[in-house]
């Protein structure tokens, strides 16, 4: 199991209602959350005061929540909705029976006033046993600590080689969108019966694949 520095530990149970009572959550999403989540614990507070690192330009605190799930299905859409409204960066440690995984919604501030977040992309590790789950809190400031966490959780899901996290995630999303376009176009070509139209679609496919190289 991941061992957070003693100075960061909170270990405070959080009522499930605390996650959505002040949010505009529709009844269906609220029920999904209730049906999926067994319990929530505020595990750790990662901040300059608890990690002895400098404050970040965009990241000031990372709240670590341990969420015990009732089943293997992760309610990602619910966690994204709630996380978008939370005024801090977060890391979720998910548990189902004896299996664990990490989930982070990579966030960026929506505006210069830092009034709310945009969830750019969600990353999740695979399920594993507690003794095999690891995480290093590396960095001289909170921005670097958060960047290191996201990169560790994302692993090979970040396909860009850019060192800057913002750029790497943005390029990864572009690459994913391009691969989806290629797959959709290949499926369309397979169904097309008119030779001329099939040729035109194939030419489009060649250009898309060139951009994907």
PLM features: residue spans?
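N-terminal, leucine/charged-rich tether regions that mediate assembly and partner docking
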Residues: 1-97
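Extended assembly-interface/linker segments at domain junctions
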Residues: 75-161
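Alpha-helical oligomerization segments
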Residues: 162, 168-213
């Amino acid at each position: 199991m991941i061992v957070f520095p003693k100075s960061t530990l909170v270990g405070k149970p959080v009522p499930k209602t605390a996650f959505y009572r002040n949010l505009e959550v529709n009844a269906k999403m609220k029920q999904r959350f209730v049906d999926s989540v067994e319990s929530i614990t505020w595990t750790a507070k990662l901040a300059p005061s608890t990690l002895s690192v400098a404050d970040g330009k965009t990241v000031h605190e990372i709240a670590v929540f341990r969420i015990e799930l009732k089943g293997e299905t992760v309610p990602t859409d619910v966690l994204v909705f709630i996380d978008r409204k939370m005024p801090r960066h977060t890391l979720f440690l998910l548990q189902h029976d004896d299996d664990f995984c990490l989930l982070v919604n990579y966030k960026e501030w929506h505006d210069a006033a830092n009034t709310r977040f945009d969830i750019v992309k969600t990353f999740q590790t695979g399920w594993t046993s507690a003794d095999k789950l690891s995480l290093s809190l590396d960095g001289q400031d909170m921005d670097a600590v958060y960047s290191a966490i996201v990169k560790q959780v994302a692993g090979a899901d970040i396909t860009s080689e850019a060192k800057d996290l913002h750029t790497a995630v943005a390029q990864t999303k572009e690459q994913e969108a391009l691969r989806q376009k290629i797959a959709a176009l290949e499926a369309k070509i397979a169904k097309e019966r008119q030779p001329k139209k099939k040729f035109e679609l194939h030419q489009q496919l060649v250009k898309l694949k060139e951009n994907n190289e």
